[in-house]
């Protein structure tokens, strides 16, 4: 069941179970998307699809229905590909502030790129990455091999940046990094390209400025960059904006209770929870909560790259070691390595 609270080493679940624990690990993944404020009055409107992953929800969309999609990243790409597979051919308008699409992954394998990017300022590292992309092209290699090398060094790169450079990255570069880091399969990219070519998919750099609706449809007012206001009428409005990491501490009862007690707090970058180098939670006034560890993407404000399976698995192993040390379990008493 879902954990609701923890007090004096006792975890209470929604099923009424009470579990005794000397140490608690928050191995949480991503929080659900948050509803945009303009969409809140339409939370129960039949045209609004706030969770495109809900079983069978995309199958309810008629083949010729008009669709608006907020967000242009991975979830949008998967949504459009799924709709297309289900026979949808109606008009789709997808929008985000920058209108950036996730790039296509390489098909097949490639040699690892030897670049190193763990020194210098953000600007210096960015310059080196761009130079290496040019070098790779001269050698007949794609930019993806360079970005894979950057991803593999993501934790050391992030931890080596100053706070100011981390903030600059999040403010100016994060959107561009995300569409190159979180890539889509070539087959999905092909679907998007085909639908753009036949005119059934428009991708816009725009903000949602107003939302109205009647009994069946929703009407979106969009403000494109450097263009006049645009009005889009949609039989369905799908939200694909991704997890609401900035609201993690309020996303479920246990985290809300821990936050209210001052045992955890959101990190300064809005990426998840504040932790120290040992993955221990940091709470109110910067106090460490020694018997509360955080594993996985919620700890990425300190560690950096913690989204891919290899990085998450390595971090989980490190958190397990920290838990055993905290509990005083001797090396000889631990499970043997496989």
Named regions from a protein language model:
Residues 1-120, 127-329, 338:
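Flavin (primarily FAD) cofactor-binding/catalytic cores of flavoenzymes
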């Amino acid at each position: 069941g879902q954990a609701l609270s923890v007090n004096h080493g006792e975890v209470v679940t929604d099923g009424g179970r009470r579990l005794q624990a000397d140490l608690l690990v928050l191995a949480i993944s991503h929080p659900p998307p948050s509803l945009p404020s303009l969409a809140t009055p339409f939370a129960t409107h039949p045209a609004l699809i706030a969770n495109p992953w809900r079983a069978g929800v995309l199958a309810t969309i008629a083949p010729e229905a008009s669709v608006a999609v907020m967000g242009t990243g991975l979830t949008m790409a998967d949504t459009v590909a799924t709709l297309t597979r289900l026979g949808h051919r109606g008009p789709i308008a997808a929008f985000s502030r920058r209108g950036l699409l996730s790039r296509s992954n390489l098909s097949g394998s490639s040699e690892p790129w030897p670049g190193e990017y763990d020194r210098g300022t953000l600007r210096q590292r960015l310059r080196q990455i761009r130079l290496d992309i040019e070098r790779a092209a001269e050698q007949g290699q794609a930019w993806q091999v360079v970005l894979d090398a950057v991803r593999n060094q993501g934790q050391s790169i992030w931890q080596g940046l100053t706070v100011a450079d981390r903030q600059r990255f999040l403010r100016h570069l994060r959107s561009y990094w995300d569409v190159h880091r979180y890539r889509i399969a070539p087959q999905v990219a092909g679907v998007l390209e085909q639908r753009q070519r036949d005119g059934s998919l428009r991708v816009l750099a725009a903000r949602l400025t107003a939302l109205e609706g009647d009994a069946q449809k929703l009407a979106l007012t969009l403000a494109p960059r450097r263009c006049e206001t645009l009005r889009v009428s949609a039989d369905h409005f799908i939200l694909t904006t991704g997890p609401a990491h900035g609201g993690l501490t309020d996303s479920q009862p246990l985290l809300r209770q821990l936050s209210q007690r001052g045992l955890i707090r959101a990190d300064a970058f809005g990426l998840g929870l504040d932790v120290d180098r040992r993955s221990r939670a940091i709470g109110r006034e910067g106090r460490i909560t020694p018997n509360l560890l955080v594993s996985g993407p919620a700890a990425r404000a300190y560690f950096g790259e913690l989204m891919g399976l290899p990085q998450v698995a390595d971090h989980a192993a490190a958190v397990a070691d920290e838990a055993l040390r905290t509990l005083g379990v001797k090396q000889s008493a631990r499970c043997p390595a496989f």
